[in-house]
Amino acid sequence: MVSRVRLYFGYTKPKVWSLLVFVGVIGAIVAINRFTLTNILLILIATVSITLGSMGAEATTNYIDRDIDAIMDRTKKRPLVTGQIKPVKGLYFGLILMFLSIIILLFFSKYLAAVFMAIGLFDNVFIYSYLTKRRTPWNIILGGFSGGFPVVIGWYTVTNAFSVLPWFLFALVVIWIPIHVWSLAYRYRDDYNRARVPMMTSIQSDRISAICISSSAVILFIFSIIPVFFKAMPYTYMIVATIIAIPMLVYSVLFVRKPDRKSSLKLFIYSSPYLAIIFVLVLIFKYL
């Protein structure tokens, strides 16, 4: 029983959805002014809903991608490929989790959050995984919006008040996703070519790929400091965020100068925790 639970848990790709849950929880926390019992319960509701939705989406996309997962070295050990989980069971598991994520929000009358949840799941499962992943090199741009929705789901689970802050955080996630995915895809471009998945990095030259990825990193930095100019964050936040971004910007320049897998890996390694660090900064400066 325990091994089966562990198998299905791993099937949902926790390394992927854990960051989505993290940014969603941050989105919920920055929306409140004080930690009352009601607010804590609302944060818990947001956390559970986002976790179930993210797990369900990843499980369902695993079902959709099972044929190409069998071709790619990086993914050929996933449960549907190895036969540890039957495809139909994997599909139902994902659909049930996604359904529960929306039902929970509706049960607690968090209608706007439920709408954003439905849109995010649709974008991830249908727009990205089913419709565009195998058809266009810009698939991650069209499907990347789903990654930003946990922030606004978290925010609008605890409050109905409008603010520019959650939408800036939403934009940060959406901009960060191509950097993260493309820099990883650049390293595994042979895998994507073998599976006939037209990722931007697998069909463009090394130079163009490096420019696209590095430009995204620069845009990410710019967006990370924009909240200051809307008075959503203090100037001290901008100073700290700029200092933290320097290594990422340096690696971006080096990647453009010498586009190879080693440079791509360095950018991937640093940009991976960058988003989480920025969100922690937002949380800290929110309550300072």
Curated annotation (Swiss-Prot):
InterPro entries the record matches: Protohaem_IX_farnesylTrfase, UbiA_prenyltransferase, UbiA_sf
Pfam families in the record: UbiA
GO-annotated biological processes: heme O biosynthetic process
EC number: 2.5.1.141
Record-level GO cellular component terms: plasma membrane
Gene3D superfamilies from the UniProt entry: UbiA prenyltransferase
Record has Phosphoprotein as a keyword: no
Domain of life the protein comes from: Archaea
This protein's pathway: Porphyrin-containing compound metabolism; heme O biosynthesis; heme O from protoheme: step 1/1
Catalysed reaction equations from the record: heme b + (2E,6E)-farnesyl diphosphate + H2O = Fe(II)-heme o + diphosphate
Bilayer topology annotation: Multi-pass membrane protein
Function recorded in the entry: Converts heme B (protoheme IX) to heme O by substitution of the vinyl group on carbon 2 of heme B porphyrin ring with a hydroxyethyl farnesyl side group.
Miscellaneous remark of the record: Carbon 2 of the heme B porphyrin ring is defined according to the Fischer nomenclature.
NCBIfam families noted in UniProt: cyoE_ctaB, PRK04375.1-2
Family to which the UniProt record says this protein belongs: Belongs to the UbiA prenyltransferase family. Protoheme IX farnesyltransferase subfamily.
Name this protein carries in UniProt: Protoheme IX farnesyltransferase
UniProt lineage: Archaea, Methanobacteriati, Thermoplasmatota, Thermoplasmata, Thermoplasmatales
